[in-house]
Amino acid sequence: MSTLHYDTFPSPIGALSVAADDSGVHHILFAQNRYDAIGRARWLHNPDAPLVREAREQLLDYLHGGRRSFDLPLAPVGTPFQLTVWRTLAQIPFGQTWSYAQLAQAVGKPAASRAVGAANGRNPLPIVLPCHRVIGANGTLTGFGGGLPTKQALL
């Protein structure tokens, strides 16, 4: 893996960090992230790296209401199952929510709601891969790496 370049910047939902290399965006982190990114100590602060700059601009545009989707090359690292779940998150339309059961059905594993939930919780690209749009079966907001107030704000 090549060196990841990153920037941390203020946003309407708090500080965000974006890390990318030439292959795509690898991580988006909230200041209060539950899980730290692997290898973060080796990242180089470079806010002018092309994909870091583009991701920052698109995220801020989205968070200010000027965008509903993203056009970024993504490079998440995970298990084959996690990657399938994360790709499926991109199918949840803006302004809609899915339950974990709906996400499991869309992944093709209708009995795997808990495994889908675990993969959702490890999403390295929140907001862009909209894990915040996944809610409990009864419509309640459930865990989110950026915190439930942030999840509510994103919805």
Task: Label every PLM stretch briefly.
Residues M1-A111:
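Basic nucleic-acid-binding alpha-helical/helix-turn surface characteristic of O6-alkylguanine DNA
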Residues K109-L155:
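Short glycine/serine-rich loop segments
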